[in-house]
Amino acid sequence: MDQKQIEEIVRSVMASMGQTAPAPSEAKCATTNCAAPVTSESCALDLGSAEAKAWIGVENPHRADVLTELRRSTVARVCTGRAGPRPRTQALLRFLADHSRSKDTVLKEVPEEWVKAQGLLEVRSEISDKNLYLTRPDMGRRLCAEAVEALKAQCVANPDVQVVISDGLSTDAITVNYEEILPPLMAGLKQAGLKVGTPFFVRYGRVKIEDQIGEILGAKVVILLVGERPGLGQSESLSCYAVYSPRMATTVEADRTCISNIHQGGTPPVEAAAVIVDLAKRMLEQKASGINMTR
């Protein structure tokens, strides 16, 4: 699917919802709006700021304009310079700061108050704490007994599409992108005339947990929005895993369709919501997902 197709899907879905699709310029990668490149080192510089990310560490460059253009074109760690065989101090400090940020978002918990404020039902997997979640991924693929009963009692049965939110490996991905992806996603699915299940939050969930959820609720399509494993300095990336008629015993990873890198510096959440709506409609039409879908 190329960019023109994505933009057409966004326009179509947003139009059916009575909203105006954002102009392509509004959905540009964050790198195009980064701060002006900085060449001097400073102990007072915030290592997580746009100014620090735009820093150029190459001393006395032959073509400074080329470095400036390269620096503005990507968020990758380029133009950092060297001090002999070693990285420069500021480049090393920023690397360590980004690494710390990524570790923090893996270890943080989604606050219970935040879940309640969104009006979401909260259930959990068989995991009881973050340490167990990181060391026993198999237990994160199954709901606890209380969660199974809660879903049967409080969720819509046999929906066309069931939307599930889970913390995964990034708390920030959920809390930062939630407001921009779930409301337009739910509105788009309903506008398409689909029976939509009760959205809920799964704490300590892994991707395969959507198979059990789909089986319990009898959902035709299950959409899981889950926090991605964070990269260096990028802790807000969300993934969507969609699967048709999942079953615990027979569904394999090739049966899932994944849309990744959903955040303001990647695929904007509102745009992703429109693409997911179109994906769900095609899954229901073809009665397939993953590699079984007709491209």
Swiss-Prot record:
Compartments (UniProt record): Bacterial microcompartment
One Pfam family in the UniProt entry: EutC
Top-level enzyme category: lyase
GO biological process, one term: amino acid metabolic process
Record protein name field: Ethanolamine ammonia-lyase small subunit
Pathway: Amine and polyamine degradation; ethanolamine degradation
Cofactor note text: Binds between the large and small subunits.
Function: Catalyzes the deamination of various vicinal amino-alcohols to oxo compounds. Allows this organism to utilize ethanolamine as the sole source of nitrogen and carbon in the presence of external vitamin B12.
EC number(s) given by UniProt: 4.3.1.7
Keyword terms: Bacterial microcompartment, Cobalamin, Cobalt, Lyase
Quaternary assembly: The basic unit is a heterodimer which dimerizes to form tetramers. The heterotetramers trimerize; 6 large subunits form a core ring with 6 small subunits projecting outwards.
Protein family membership: Belongs to the EutC family.
Residues binding adenosylcob(III)alamin, per UniProt: 207, 228, 258
Underlying gene: eutC
Cofactor: adenosylcob(III)alamin
Species of the source: Escherichia coli (strain 55989 / EAEC)
Listed HAMAP family: EutC
GO CC aspect terms: ethanolamine ammonia-lyase complex; ethanolamine degradation polyhedral organelle
Keyword Lyase: yes
Catalytic activity reported: ethanolamine = acetaldehyde + NH4(+)
Record-level Gene Ontology MF annotations: cobalamin binding; ethanolamine ammonia-lyase activity
Main subcellular location: other
